[in-house]
Regions:
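N-terminal secretory signal peptides that target proteins for export/translocation
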Residues: 1-4
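Pepsin/retropepsin-fold aspartyl endopeptidases
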Residues: 19-418
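Bacterial N-terminal signal peptides
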Residues: 7-16
Length: 418
């Protein structure tokens, strides 16, 4: 009998060890912001921790599931580090959707857990200003089709014509002080001063303003938040009045799905669509839009930034392209252009890097691998993919309802018509 009793732990122990290993894998992917891997792991383990279920829901634009799941976890008073991360994600979800008061509530809840959190303390003055405005809302037509002007969208902002770039790498829409006044917007200064950082890590001072109305075709958004920067800021300083701005992630997400073509047609479509989580190849990492691209045999996450004129690869990419770097890489000093000015970085120049992105092969020719990490996203992601890569396609679709990126070349479009 005692021998049989001693045998019981031998049967149970591997099962317990397997469960611990599974949780360890999920935690590793979560800590490394690897949402595509975490999604795939959860599909194999449907009874996993609610925290990871909620995290994946947040990342793949399932806001209701994200919030409901996290509220269940918060109700049992999790560890402070877990509670902080949930409030951080919930604040990002709210800000992406233009729910300003809810974003402030989550920031304040985070600061109750950790009053010294520098990111929350830094972003609170901005969000506090926005919380006094009604939430962003969308109305009007479900679809719009417009002709772009050299990549800029024809808009009406508070009834006045504007022509703005669209920038998936911008946490919030941004415009110059002169354009804000042109549109009759009241500029407010956050307490303690507003400071943000551009793609190069340069500090940029800003005010805050909210447009009562922003119209694209027949689609109207109300209460759209803008950061307001000085008239001397790049790239606005050399632009004409009415063109000194860009449309950021909360507006683009509200469009539902957006498609643009090489001949300048831009379409937005808010119609309902059925999503398939396993097929999603874009996700959110807080206020970053992330896409998965393949290099050789590696599936890698990158920041997707339609506002970047040129793509840059980050230090992590050098690790997976080690052979290519050794064979054909040369040293260079590479200039990165940001709103706060130009900055030079030590980099490795490669003649060509081919990525499979959104179902199509596209080449960075040449490719620049920065040797130093510019911002926190460089810890988790392999580069910043810009419009130079996307414009190699005949048409591009970013669909926030299905969380997919699709690139089509001329052959693909002809085949679709057939």
């Amino acid at each position: 009998m005692r021998v049989q009793g001693l045998g019981l732990p031998i049967l149970v122990f591997p099962i317990a060890l397997s469960a611990l290993a599974a949780q360890s894998e999920l935690r590793k992917q979560s800590d490394a912001h690897q949402m595509f891997l975490l999604r795939d792991a959860l599909s194999r383990r449907p009874r996993s921790s609610d925290f990871y279920v909620g995290e994946v829901a947040c990342a793949f634009n399932k806001s209701s599931t994200c919030e409901e799941t996290f509220q269940k976890v918060l109700a049992v008073e999790p560890k402070p580090s877990v509670a902080k991360r949930m409030h951080e994600m919930l604040a990002a979800v709210a800000l992406r959707e233009g729910r300003y008061r809810r974003a402030l509530q989550e920031i304040d809840a985070l600061l109750l857990v950790d009053p010294n959190d520098s990111d929350a303390k830094g972003s609170r003055p901005l969000i506090e200003v926005l919380s006094h405005f009604p939430d962003q809302a969308v109305q009007g037509a479900s679809k719009a089709s417009v002709q772009m002007d050299d990549g800029k969208l024809p808009l009406l902002i508070n009834g006045t014509r504007a022509s703005y770039f669209f920038d998936s790498g911008a946490n919030l829409s941004t415009l110059s002080e002169s354009d804000a006044l042109r549109f009759g917007m009241e500029i407010q200064e956050p307490k303690s001063g507003g400071v943000s950082t551009d793609i190069s890590g340069n500090r940029v001072s800003f005010g805050v303003a909210v447009a009562k109305s922003l119209v694209l075709g027949g689609i109207e958004l109300r209460n759209v938040a803008f950061l307001v920067v000085g008239n001397e800021q790049q790239p606005f300083v050399d632009m004409e009045p009415g063109q000194r701005g860009l449309i950021g992630l909360p507006v683009l997400r509200a469009f539902g799905s957006m498609t643009w073509t090489r001949d300048g047609v831009f379409e937005a479509d808010r119609s309902p669509a059925t999503s398939n989580l396993s097929a999603a190849n874009i996700c959110f990492d807080d206020l970053y839009l992330i896409t998965q691209a393949s290099f050789e045999r590696h599936a890698l996450p990158f920041v997707l930034d339609t506002g970047a004129a040129t793509s840059e690869l980050w230090p992590k990419f050098a690790g997976v392209a080690r052979d290519l770097v050794r064979k054909s890489g040369t040293h260079e000093s590479h200039t990165v252009i940001g709103m706060g000015g130009n900055q030079k970085f030590e980099a490795t120049l490669l003649p060509k890097v081919v990525l499979n992105l959104g179902g199509m092969s596209a080449a960075l020719q040449p490719a620049h691998i920065l040797k130093t990490q510019q911002r926190d996203a460089g810890k988790w992601f392999y580069g910043n993919l810009g419009i130079d890569l996307l414009r190699q396609a005949q048409s591009v679709t970013i669909n926030f309802k299905t969380m997919t990126l699709q690139l089509y070349n001329a052959i693909d479009r002809r085949m679709r018509r057939e």
